[in-house]
Amino acid sequence: MNKAILHTIIVYTLASCPYCIKAKALLDEKNVAYEEIEVSNFTQEEKEKFIKKSGGKKTVPQIFIDNMHVGGCDALFDLEKEGRLDKLLENQPKTTSPAAGA
């Protein structure tokens, strides 16, 4: 069965987290669509699933591209600095409008 995925980039966040805001700003600059999942209201079961999916990490943001765990904000910016982020994002759905401030 072929399952269509609307967003293949998922960012687990907290609204007040400055690293989450920074990571989302970079993705916005790249004009790629992503699904943001706010973790503050997770049940205990959801928290456990999140931690397991994130390889034991309990911090946010946690970023996934095509079901691959990228890591947090620093890891995302490391990919950008190394010139590898654009390659990971090249087949991702684009946003319909340019990034704010562009």
Swiss-Prot record:
GO terms for biological process: cell redox homeostasis; cellular response to oxidative stress. Gene3D superfamilies: Glutaredoxin. Residues 1-96 form the Glutaredoxin domain. GO terms for molecular function: glutathione disulfide oxidoreductase activity. InterPro entries: GLR_AS, Glutaredoxin, Glutaredoxin_subgr, GRX_bact, Thioredoxin-like_sf. GO terms for cellular component: cytoplasm. Disulfide bonds join C17-C20. PROSITE patterns: GLUTAREDOXIN_1 (PS00195), GLUTAREDOXIN_2 (PS51354). Pfam families: Glutaredoxin. Keywords: Cytoplasm, Disulfide bond, Electron transport, Redox-active center, Transport. It is found in: Cytoplasm. Has a glutathione-disulfide oxidoreductase activity in the presence of NADPH and glutathione reductase. Reduces low molecular weight disulfides and proteins. PANTHER family: GLUTAREDOXIN 2, GLUTAREDOXIN-1-RELATED. Monomer. Belongs to the glutaredoxin family. This is Glutaredoxin 1. The gene is grxC1.
